[in-house]
């Protein structure tokens, strides 16, 4: 289905009963073709981490239960899920009776797997689970005194490097883009680990800031950044992790790595989640 038929940016009615048809799928191949990424031979591994904060159902006695969920959609899935449709889908459980939280988890994972055409994993947690906030790992580059004047299309020509090999981790809280459909702002913290030619921090920060008025989905922004870095410095190793601020009861955190046996960064939330 074309993106114009999705519920993004439109007035919506919340369903009173569980409805899997609310989930709206978006083929990954469309945006990847734009980036020159071969969907049959991806240059990365990883997942999209979805944290959901509006999750409720009824137990067999009609008593409400509330919780939060974390779901992992593999990068090699055929489709992603449009975020507003996922929000409406989750809220369709509000008056739905389930035998247990495990049953709710099973239903959601099965539905997501069917829609994305991949094995989606995840877990649902009770609302009183203790949560600790973390901070981005690596060296923060945000305090550099730079002049910025490019806020249009992302400009990969801004990526410069030094002819010295390094293995390092850097981060920035200044990534911002806009939703492809609604133009609502997506605020992100990006953590980059790489081994290769040393990125020049000042020019790379300008590059990240050039996304400021870019209208793309979170997943496409992540893959654009990954691809641009790869093309610029041909690193021996590269991973990026973007933690987006919560919006509409959901935050989306894409992770991409050249390492097939990757380990996800800490699952501690950052302050904007």
Swiss-Prot record:
<feature type="binding site">
    <location>
        <begin position="218"/>
        <end position="219"/>
    </location>
    <ligand>
        <name>substrate</name>
    </ligand>
</feature>
<feature type="active site" description="Thioimide intermediate">
    <location>
        <position position="179"/>
    </location>
</feature>
<dbReference type="InterPro" id="IPR016428">
    <property type="entry name" value="QueF_type2"/>
</dbReference>
<dbReference type="InterPro" id="IPR043133">
    <property type="entry name" value="GTP-CH-I_C/QueF"/>
</dbReference>
<dbReference type="InterPro" id="IPR029500">
    <property type="entry name" value="QueF"/>
</dbReference>
<protein>
    <recommendedName>
        <fullName>NADPH-dependent 7-cyano-7-deazaguanine reductase</fullName>
        <ecNumber>1.7.1.13</ecNumber>
    </recommendedName>
</protein>
<feature type="binding site">
    <location>
        <begin position="81"/>
        <end position="83"/>
    </location>
    <ligand>
        <name>substrate</name>
    </ligand>
</feature>
<dbReference type="GO" id="GO:0006400">
    <property type="term" value="P:tRNA modification"/>
</dbReference>
<dbReference type="GO" id="GO:0008616">
    <property type="term" value="P:queuosine biosynthetic process"/>
</dbReference>
<feature type="binding site">
    <location>
        <begin position="83"/>
        <end position="84"/>
    </location>
    <ligand>
        <name>NADPH</name>
    </ligand>
</feature>
<keyword id="KW-0521">NADP</keyword>
<dbReference type="GO" id="GO:0033739">
    <property type="term" value="F:preQ1 synthase activity"/>
</dbReference>
<dbReference type="InterPro" id="IPR029139">
    <property type="entry name" value="QueF_N"/>
</dbReference>
<comment type="similarity">
    <text>Belongs to the GTP cyclohydrolase I family. QueF type 2 subfamily.</text>
</comment>
<comment type="pathway">
    <text>tRNA modification; tRNA-queuosine biosynthesis.</text>
</comment>
<keyword id="KW-0560">Oxidoreductase</keyword>
<dbReference type="GO" id="GO:0005737">
    <property type="term" value="C:cytoplasm"/>
</dbReference>
<keyword id="KW-0963">Cytoplasm</keyword>
<comment type="subunit">
    <text>Homodimer.</text>
</comment>
<dbReference type="Pfam" id="PF14489">
    <property type="entry name" value="QueF"/>
</dbReference>
<keyword id="KW-0671">Queuosine biosynthesis</keyword>
<feature type="binding site">
    <location>
        <begin position="247"/>
        <end position="248"/>
    </location>
    <ligand>
        <name>NADPH</name>
    </ligand>
</feature>
<dbReference type="InterPro" id="IPR050084">
    <property type="entry name" value="NADPH_dep_7-cyano-7-deazaG_red"/>
</dbReference>
<comment type="function">
    <text>Catalyzes the NADPH-dependent reduction of 7-cyano-7-deazaguanine (preQ0) to 7-aminomethyl-7-deazaguanine (preQ1).</text>
</comment>
<feature type="active site" description="Proton donor">
    <location>
        <position position="186"/>
    </location>
</feature>
<dbReference type="Pfam" id="PF14819">
    <property type="entry name" value="QueF_N"/>
</dbReference>
